[in-house]
Design a protein with these regions (language model features):
Chain B
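Bacterial N-terminal signal peptides that target proteins for export
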Residues: 1-11
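Extended intrinsically disordered, low-complexity coil regions enriched in Ser, Thr, Gly, Ala
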Residues: 98-104, 217-220
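Surface-exposed interaction/gating patches
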Residues: 89, 95, 163-215
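Long, well-ordered hydrophobic secondary-structure segments characteristic of membrane-embedded
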Residues: 80, 86-92, 100-105
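The canonical Cys-X-X-Cys-His
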Residues: 100-111, 161, 189, 199-211, ...
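Post-cleavage N-terminal segment of exported redox proteins
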Residues: 12-15, 19-84, 112, 122-187, ...
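Short cysteine/histidine-rich zinc-coordinating motifs and their immediately flanking basic loops
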Residues: 114-121, 216-222
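An amphipathic alpha-helical core segment
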Residues: 205-232, 236-239
């Protein structure tokens, strides 16, 4: 199952100083709500990504708490202003404790 | 219980739309929208944005989708269908079966070898003595050329490979052939399309040929074209095949669906594809 979960990010590789850039993220994930029943009538256990955080050079710049009503394959995007070059680190946390990560450098010229 | 739906409500909604249409035909002045142009599709024809999604009077399901759904399809990053294409790309070079081969061993670069292939399917396949669609064709290569077991219909690897092969034809016009050995199967598919079925006694054509542009419950009825398939469907919260869609449309009128991959649905697939000849492939599309 875990092998099916893949994070994807789209971040511009370069930006002008103080330019506002759009960051897009998507993680393939079933987001099982814990509300559904299987064909035997048994509850399918909840398994969602419950948190997503982004840090720029170690400093938090974005954080989202995700709830069970969010669709499969959650897509999140936000805007960011960078005044210096650095690394963006993305972290998704799963109910089962797994943590998925992605990283990309941005060069600010 | 988010999946619970009332079949009675759905039935009532469908009957209501067909019923109200009958009334409109009788007295066009009753409906302002109808009186305006007499045609619910006029707004789409008039929108230059949709030119690329039309071929003459044929309109892709994209045209009928909400702006939010369209935006999801437009951006490959946002389009969750691209995840299936990625799965397929990985499957493409996976060695499986007794012959020790992957798809790539024989077909090399899919961007070259598979370009334009999917838009000509379903087609008559001599090895089956009947039609094959892309899923069947992939499984033929698995059993014959790779000595590997067939992939299960709607399984992740088969959906992925289908998406990957179909994606190589994105932007190319659907161009199925219905003459020669395909002709009798095409006729079967056409018969299916015009046959009333289910407790509601409604044929495909009554919804998708006679009433596109009308509302049915919360849905905007499209022409029921297949150029976007396989598709990421928001209602399914997953990627799915055209035959899965057929199954849903049969259930919509409370008819017993046929199995996915069956001859009935494959013949129907050829008829539906032919109706859309000239529309450009959008694989993978996003639909509600």
């Amino acid at each position: 199952m875990a092998a099916d979960i893949k994070p994807r990010i789209r971040v511009p590789q370069t930006a002008k100083k103080d330019e506002i850039i759009e960051i897009k993220t998507l993680i393939s994930h079933p987001m099982e709500s814990g509300q559904r029943k299987d064909s035997q009538g048994k509850i399918i256990p909840r398994k969602i990504i419950n948190k997503m955080t982004v840090a720029f050079n170690g400093k938090p710049v974005f954080e989202a708490k995700l709830e069970p009503s969010i669709s499969a394959n959650p897509y999140l995007s936000f805007f960011l202003k960078c005044s210096a070059s650095g690394n963006l680190d993305f972290t998704w946390t799963d109910d089962d404790g797994s943590v998925y990560k992605a990283t990309q450098a941005i060069t600010v010229a | 219980m988010p999946r619970l739906r009332s079949p009675l409500l759905t039935a009532a909604a469908a009957l209501a739309v067909l019923g109200s249409l009958a009334a409109c035909d009788g007295d066009k002045s009753k409906s302002a929208a109808m009186a305006d142009s007499g045609d619910p599709l006029a707004q789409y024809r008039a929108n230059p944005k949709y030119k690329a999604f039309m071929a003459g009077e044929k309109m892709s399901g994209y045209v009928f989708a909400s702006p939010e759904t369209q935006a999801m399809q437009d951006d490959d990053f946002e389009n969750p269908g691209m995840l299936a294409v990625q799965d397929g790309e990985e499957e493409w070079s996976k060695v499986e079966g007794a012959a020790g081969k992957s798809c790539a061993s024989c077909h090399q670069d899919a961007a070259k070898s598979m370009k334009g292939v999917a838009v000509s399917y379903p087609k008559f396949e001599p090895k089956r003595g009947k039609l094959a669609n892309i899923e069947h064709r992939i499984n033929l290569c698995r059993t014959e050329h790779m000595k590997a077991p067939e992939l299960k219909w709607e399984s992740k690897p088969l959906l992925g490979l289908t998406a990957y092969v179909e994606h190589q034809s994105r932007g190319l016009p659907i161009s199925v052939k219905v003459d020669g050995p395909a002709a009798p199967f095409f006729e079967e598919g056409k018969k299916f399309y015009y046959t009333r079925r289910g407790q509601m006694d409604i044929a495909c054509a009554q919804c998708h040929e006679q009433n596109p542009g009308m509302n049915i419950g919360v849905e905007n009825l499209s022409q029921g074209q297949s150029n976007g398939y396989p598709t990421y469907r928001l209602k399914w919260q997953s990627f799915g095949s055209l035959h899965r869609r057929f199954e849903g449309c049969n259930q919509e009128v409370r008819a017993e669906p046929y199995p996915r991959g069956s001859d009935e649905y494959t013949n129907l697939e050829l008829y539906v594809a032919w109706r859309g000849n000239g529309l450009k492939s959008e694989a993978p599309s996003v639909r509600r």
